[in-house]
Structure formats: structure tokens, C-alpha cells
């Protein structure tokens, strides 16, 4: 039971059905007994509601690319190799460690951390596009780590560093950090090493050297995949080959945010506002 993230709307706790013993086995139920507010109801079921509307805004969002598809990057099986979303949970005060960034296997503070950029993105075998937010997310997380553990050494393996607009100031700030090293090169392999460490194999594109480097923890900057790439809606929505919405306005359906393309928070908010205004204009014009 946890609050999904700090800005969740509504800002209430939820039960994770994949982890809840009561929902999985029918046994336990201790949470319901100790909840003084009586807020836990294990018998609550999904409800189907039918309504008619003059316009629809599709803001179905995105999901991280499934790391199990990335065989060369450990396929989610290498210990202490986490995704950027999992690291975000570790850094969250509402997360399992109360905001402490530690190794999942033993709770130790990592002294060497590597970030692997474009984990699934810009790859014709996976996501054939740039996910837009991954570089900025990594730069943000590098700052998390530098603030919490100034002595921890960080390596960032990248194809290209993309910091659009004024975000370049963040890139310059992280580059100036003495404990952060940027290595241009596409990671070829992530494998288990001794003591639950992780070995990264990469070719340094600048020096032309093949490197085998060990880290206490590795973070995969997994790509952004539209939810509709794997989950369908009962709507006449034209999708492109990657699962992003292409059109639908003539039917009164307006896509917003990452349902249309990879976007950051600010541009997602702008896209949502624009879609809502178009929907209002459509209803008023009828």
C-alpha cells in the first residue's frame, strides 16, 4: 500500500494487486484490520460505466519500455541493474527506502553507478525513435545522487546527449560535477559480476577503445512507449507504427500528451490544455 508518486491525483494510497497477499492468495487481510479509517475494501471490483459525450480527450499516457525485451542489457535479470523508473521510486520519499538510493540486493550505498542511455530507444529492433525525456531524467537523477552521496562516482554512457532549449543549463551543471563522467558509446552488454556487482561492456566512440567496467549499480534509461502500443481502446483511433495517435479530430476525439508523441511534463500540460480547448470548441459548435 503506497501513494504512487508525490503529485498523484487523487493524492491517496493504493493497493498494489501484484504484491498484496490478500488479493493474490485470499489470506492475510491484516491491513484492513489495522486501518482505523476503514479505507481498505478487498471486495471492491471493477465497474463498467456507460456515458455519452460530445467529445473525448485521449490522454492515455505512456509506460516504460519492457526491459525484459533487452536481452543484451540483462533483460531485467541482472541484480542491482534497475530502470530509471525504479531509481525514481528509490529516490522518492514515498518509496520503499524512504528516499535513500541504495542497492536493492543488500541496501548498501553504491560507490560506483552507471547510467545506460537509450535503453530500447533509437533502436530499429525496439523503439525506433528518441524518447525525448531520458537524457533529462538521467541528468536529474545524477543530481539526486551527487546531493545524497557527493563521493559516489557516476558514469553516463550515451549515443547523443539531448537537452532541448534552456535545459542545456542543467547539462552544463552536471558536466561540471567532478564525480560525473560522460562516455560516448552504445553499451553492448550488461552482465552480472562478483559480489552482485554489474559489468558494463561498451566501446568508447571517442577513444576507439572497448571497455569492461564494473559498477555497484547500473541504471537503464528505458524508453517511453505510448500506452496504446500495447493497450487498445474501443475508439476509432488511427495509430502510427509506434502506437502514437495520428488524427481522430473529425470524430470528436483529441489526443493529448504522450498519446501523441514523447513529451516532457511542461509540453504535456500544454498539449492537454490545447486538446481540452479543441474539445470544448467542438461541443459548442454543434
Where on the chain are the PLM-derived regions?
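Residues forming the flavin
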Residues: 1-286
Amino acid at each position: 500500500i503506497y501513494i504512487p508518486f508525490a503529485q498523484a491525483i487523487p493524492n491517496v494510497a493504493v493497493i498494489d494487486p501484484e504484491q498484496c497477499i490478500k488479493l493474490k492468495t485470499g489470506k492475510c487481510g491484516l491491513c484492513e484490520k489495522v486501518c482505523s479509517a476503514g479505507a481498505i475494501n478487498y471486495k471492491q471490483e471493477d465497474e463498467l460505466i456507460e456515458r455519452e459525450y460530445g467529445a473525448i480527450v485521449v490522454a492515455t499516457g505512456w509506460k516504460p519500455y519492457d526491459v525484459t525485451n533487452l536481452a543484451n542489457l540483462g533483460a531485467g535479470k541482472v541484480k542491482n541493474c534497475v530502470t530509471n523508473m525504479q531509481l525514481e521510486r528509490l529516490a522518492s520519499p514515498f518509496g520503499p527506502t524512504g528516499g535513500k538510493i541504495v542497492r536493492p540486493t543488500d541496501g548498501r550505498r553504491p560507490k560506483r553507478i552507471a547510467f545506460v542511455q537509450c535503453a530500447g530507444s533509437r533502436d530499429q529492433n525496439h523503439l525506433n525513435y528518441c524518447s525525448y525525456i531520458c537524457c533529462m531524467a538521467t541528468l536529474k537523477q545524477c543530481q539526486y545522487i551527487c546531493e545524497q552521496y557527493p563521493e559516489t562516482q557516476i558514469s553516463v554512457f550515451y549515443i547523443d546527449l539531448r537537452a532541448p532549449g534552456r535545459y542545456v543549463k542543467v547539462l552544463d551543471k552536471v558536466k561540471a560535477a567532478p564525480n560525473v563522467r560522460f562516455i560516448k558509446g552504445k553499451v553492448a552488454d550488461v552482465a552480472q559480476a562478483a559480489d552482485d556487482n554489474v559489468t558494463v561492456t561498451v566501446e568508447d566512440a571517442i577513444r576507439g577503445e572497448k571497455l569492461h567496467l564494473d559498477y555497484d549499480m547500473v541504471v537503464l534509461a528505458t524508453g517511453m512507449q505510448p500506452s496504446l502500443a500495447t493497450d487498445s481502446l474501443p475508439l476509432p483511433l488511427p495509430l502510427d507504427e509506434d502506437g502514437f495517435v495520428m488524427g481522430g479530430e473529425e470524430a470528436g476525439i483529441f489526443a493529448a500528451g504522450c498519446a501523441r508523441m514523447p513529451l516532457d511534463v511542461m509540453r504535456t500540460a500544454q498539449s492537454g490544455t490545447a486538446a481540452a480547448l479543441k474539445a470544448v470548441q467542438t461541443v459548442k459548435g454543434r
